[in-house]
Curated annotation (Swiss-Prot):
Xref: InterPro entries: Adenylosuccin_syn_GTP-bd, Adenylosuccin_syn_Lys_AS, Adenylosuccinate_synth_dom1, Adenylosuccinate_synth_dom2, Adenylosuccinate_synth_dom3, Adenylosuccinate_synthetase, P-loop_NTPase
The protein's name: Adenylosuccinate synthetase
Protein's job: Plays an important role in the de novo pathway of purine nucleotide biosynthesis. Catalyzes the first committed step in the biosynthesis of AMP from IMP.
Cofactor: Mg(2+)
Source species: Lactobacillus gasseri (strain ATCC 33323 / DSM 20243 / BCRC 14619 / CIP 102991 / JCM 1131 / KCTC 3163 / NCIMB 11718 / NCTC 13722 / AM63)
Pathway the protein acts in: Purine metabolism; AMP biosynthesis via de novo pathway; AMP from IMP: step 1/2
Lineage: superkingdom: Bacteria
UniProt KW Magnesium keyword: yes
Binding positions (Mg(2+)): 13, 40
GO molecular function terms noted in the UniProt entry: adenylosuccinate synthase activity; GTP binding; magnesium ion binding
The gene coding this protein: purA
Catalytic activity field: IMP + L-aspartate + GTP = N(6)-(1,2-dicarboxyethyl)-AMP + GDP + phosphate + 2 H(+)
Subunit-structure text: Homodimer.
CDD domains membership: AdSS
């Protein structure tokens, strides 16, 4: 197969960075198609840990480098900070390609994000306040500033003046906040444009040319299916399409070009921010999972909400994202546990259901129906093959695959690239 998409099948933070790094060593290029620096990913290579929010994970191994597609919203300051850190560690970034159609996060987007969240009080969404939502709002309103605009002084000046007039009216009259100054932004972002110029191109052409040559292309999704603007737990979602269908529009290619869609999940479930979470654990078991797995946000540092594995949510993700392979991470967390639970269905107002409700009110009333499985005592962090896994670990994995209806291709037993058990090579599916 020449085109593999990796998508989060839960609420993000599933460990997509690890599997994309693992797969990218055989890829010609790694491509990111949505989101911005609200989506943190951690890569561990040897004794080095890389925490990134914008640059694709495949920058470390893909033969022709990494691509940032038109569906991504770019904070130039964050991007260049990451690139500088990578260069200091000896990582070759010369193969980076940035879409000329990608939208740029401006200072007023970050402020708007912050002011809106503050104004909502108890009804806040729980955004990372990085300006992602307001940037996508401007994109949909057709007033956004794109990467190509930063390369044209007159175009950028006109758009920035127009947008600042609107944003400053909002800030001063609605939020009672100070106005932003044109001169504090204009030259700084023009300079970003010039610094970015050597990487900027029509990435749709780059990616489609690679696919036409039957080169292996790895598509990296950001966040997770349950945060998709259409298919997730709306309004507690992100501002972009995180399902595999969003990859096509976020790159500029036909949806039929994807061969395999790998859904990445944890052996349990986590969520950051507000919103329904049927299997959430608010007890010492949840605390134990959180501390064992170091479940704190890469971007915010916030403790993640923790719950048991939810096969109802996974089946929803499978259907809407076209997932046909599963990559499960953090199996090692359950070593030493007595038992593990899997939600096989929900109970809603006394009735058993096997679907994921659209209504928030219904979701908040849903109670998980659990199936209990025995855990294992063995340390599995050095296990390399399926055969060497404890029998109870195999039973758990088989049950997950059976309930979701998708075969497992990889199982992770630790953070390092080498701590990955490959059941089937996705490039050969």
């Amino acid at each position: 197969m020449t085109a593999i998409a990796v998508v989060g099948s839960q609420w993000g933070d599933e460990g997509k960075g690890k599997i994309t790094d693992f797969l990218s060593k055989d890829a010609a290029m790694a491509v990111r198609s949505n989101g911005g620096n609200n989506a943190g990913h951690t890569i561990e290579i040897g004794d080095k840990t890389f925490k990134m929010r914008l640059i694709p994970s495949g920058i470390f191994a893909a033969k022709k480098g990494a691509v940032i597609g038109n569906g991504v919203v770019i904070n130039p300051e964050v991007m260049f900070g990451e690139l500088d850190n990578l260069e200091k560690e000896g990582i070759d970034i010369s193969g980076l390609k940035i879409s000329n159609r990608a939208h740029v996060i401006m200072p007023y987007h970050i402020l708007q994000d912050t002011y809106q969240e503050e104004a909502k009080g108890d009804k806040k969404i729980g955004t990372t306040k990085n300006g992602i939502g307001p940037c996508y709002m401007d994109k949909a309103s057709r007033i956004g500033i794109r990467v190509c605009d930063l390369l044209e002084r007159d175009t950028f000046e006109e758009k920035l003046r127009t947008n600042l007039a609107e944003k400053n009216a909002l800030f001063t009259k609605v939020y009672n906040k100070p106005a932003l100054k044109f001169e504090d932004i204009f030259e700084k972002y023009l300079e970003y444009g010039q610094k970015m110029k050597k990487y900027v191109t029509d990435t749709s052409v780059v990616v489609n040319d690679a696919l036409d040559k039957n080169e292996k292309v790895l598509f990296e999704g950001a966040q997770g299916v349950m945060l998709d603007i259409d298919e997730g737990t709306y309004p507690y979602v992100t501002s972009s399409n995180t399902i595999s269908g969003g990859i096509a529009s976020g790159i500029g290619m036909g949806a039929n070009r994807l061969n395999t869609v790998i859904g990445v999940c944890k052996a349990y479930t986590t969520r950051v921010g507000e919103g329904p979470f049927p299997t959430e654990l608010l007890d010492e078991v949840g605390d134990r999972i959180r501390e064992t797995a170091h479940e704190y946000g890469t971007v915010t540092g916030r403790p993640r909400r923790v719950g048991w594995f939810d096969s109802v949510a996974l089946r929803h993700a499978k259907r809407v994202a076209g997932i046909n392979a599963l990559s499960l991470n953090l199996l090692d967390v359950f070593s030493g546990f007595d038992k593990i639970k899997i939600a096989t269905a929900y109970e809603l107002d006394g009735k058993k259901i096997d679907y994921y409700p659209a209504s928030l009110k219904e979701l908040y009333r849903c109670k998980p129906v659990y199936e209990e499985l025995p855990a294992w005592d063995e340390d599995i962090t050095n296990v390399k093959t399926w055969e060497d896994l404890p029998e109870n670990a195999k039973k758990f994995l088989n049950r997950v695959s059976e309930l979701v209806g998708v075969p497992l291709v990889t199982v992770s037993v630790g953070p390092d690239r080498e701590q990955t058990i490959v059941l089937k090579n996705p490039w050969e599916m």
